[in-house]
Regions:
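Basic K/R-rich, polyanion-interacting modules in nucleoproteins and related proteins
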Residues: 1-5
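A residue-level signal for beta-strand positions that form part of recognition/binding surfaces
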Residues: 6-9, 78, 225, 323-324
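Active-site-proximal beta-strand elements of phosphoester/diester hydrolases
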Residues: 9-14, 327
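Substrate-binding/active-site clefts of carbohydrate-active enzymes
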Residues: 13-37, 41-194, 204-223, 227
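Extracellular, beta-strand-rich glycan-interacting domains
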Residues: 197
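Conserved alpha/beta catalytic core and glycan-binding cleft of carbohydrate-active enzymes
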Residues: 216-218, 222-348
Length: 348
């Protein structure tokens, strides 16, 4: 890949992609479904050159010991970050199978010229009690808030609640040396052992800028073409200074790291907060500047009136390649369904 801006990324979930009988897969819902020629052919017909796979590490809610039982989750409930999810393997009870089949999947996609981007969720754990982090060093890996003192990043803060910028009951403390080291070693492991081509950071705004920049530098040592981007926001207020957070507004401070552009997304299809409202794609006026901001790639441009851009009143990208353009993802309706609900009388 000569330039990150040349990527056309298809977000997918292992089970969703091949579980339906119409997929005619020998391995429905499994890693190996992405080794089958007809499934790879389908991806190629879409014109994509990269797949962004929803969390593929070992997560909490699916019971791997009952493969015959219909179970489903996106995977944003991390358990063990550095091992593939067993329910996507053909034999979760045999440890090496999930490892081998994940590698077979990556190899097959690479052979077809398709890059593999892994969705990673280092910003929180499924549970605090019983988590590997908490068992190793209680209350070190998680931020807490102190009553009457606002947000606090102090190690071992007592009397406060666990901070919850993830909306899932906790948030990890990426700014602390051992958590930072864990993240650095984890991404390096996925690249060196499984040959992953990039990472999509869930709720990247919870992490600190310094850690994200160190991750970029660490991966550059291996392969500068490895892609890094993420959600430049959080589900709440992180318990560290906002100016330290890897938010979308701070993308220009993170060279080589991109952020999802919700300005252009909602300008094209309508606001995320109301599925019945349409926008530019329906011929609605008032969204032109937001669309133009997306076209120039989130950088400062004399042709864009930032006062009329939704969500952002200042450019946030230093390079257009940091601006991740999209119109739909797993968090909302597909574009087709979104247009159906927001444009009365629209036909297929």
């Amino acid at each position: 890949l000569e330039n990150a801006s040349d990527m056309v990324v298809y977000e997918m979930h292992h089970r969703d992609f091949s579980i339906h009988p119409s997929s005619k897969s020998r391995y429905p819902g499994k890693f190996l479904a992405l080794t089958e020629p007809h499934n790879i052919w389908y991806l190629k017909t879409l014109g994509v050159n990269a797949v962004q796979i929803l969390p593929s590490y070992d997560y909490f809610t699916v019971d791997e010991s009952q493969p015959e039982k219909p179970q489903y989750n996106w995977g944003y409930d991390p358990l063990n970050y550095n091992v593939p999810e067993g329910s996507y393997s053909t034999d979760a009870r045999t440890p090496e199978v999930r490892i081998r089949e994940f590698k077979q999947m990556v190899q097959a996609l690479h052979d077809a010229g398709i890059r593999v981007i892994l969705d990673v969720v280092y910003n929180h754990c499924m549970n605090i009690d019983g988590s590997n982090f908490q068992l190793t060093y209680p209350d070190y890996y998680y931020r807490k808030t102190a009553p009457g003192q606002g947000a606090s990043g102090d190690i071992g803060t007592t009397g406060g609640d666990y901070a919850n910028a993830s909306g899932c009951g906790n948030e990890t403390a990426s700014e602390r040396p051992l958590m930072r080291r864990f993240m650095l070693e984890s991404v390096r492991y996925w690249v060196e052992e499984y040959h992953i081509d990039g990472f999509r950071f869930d709720l990247m705004g919870i992490h600190d800028i310094e850690t994200m920049n160190l991750i970029r530098k660490e991966l550059d040592k291996i392969d500068p073409s490895i892609t890094i981007y993420g959600e430049g926001w959080a589900a709440g207020s992180p318990a560290i200074d906002y100016n330290l957070c890897a938010m979308k507004a701070h993308t220009y401070r993170m060279p080589g790291i991109g952020a999802f552009a919700d300005e252009m997304r909602d300008a094209l299809r309508g606001p995320f907060s109301d599925d019945t409202q349409s926008a530019y794609l329906a011929g609605k006026a008032g969204h032109e500047e937001s669309v133009k901001f997306g076209i120039v790639g989130g950088i400062a441009h004399n042709g864009v009136d930032m006062s009329k851009v939704n969500y952002s009143k200042a450019a946030w990208a230093a390079q257009p390649s940091q601006h991740v353009s999209y119109v739909s993802c797993h968090d909302d309706m597909s574009l087709v369904d979104r247009l159906r609900t927001s444009i009365p009388g629209i036909s297929d």
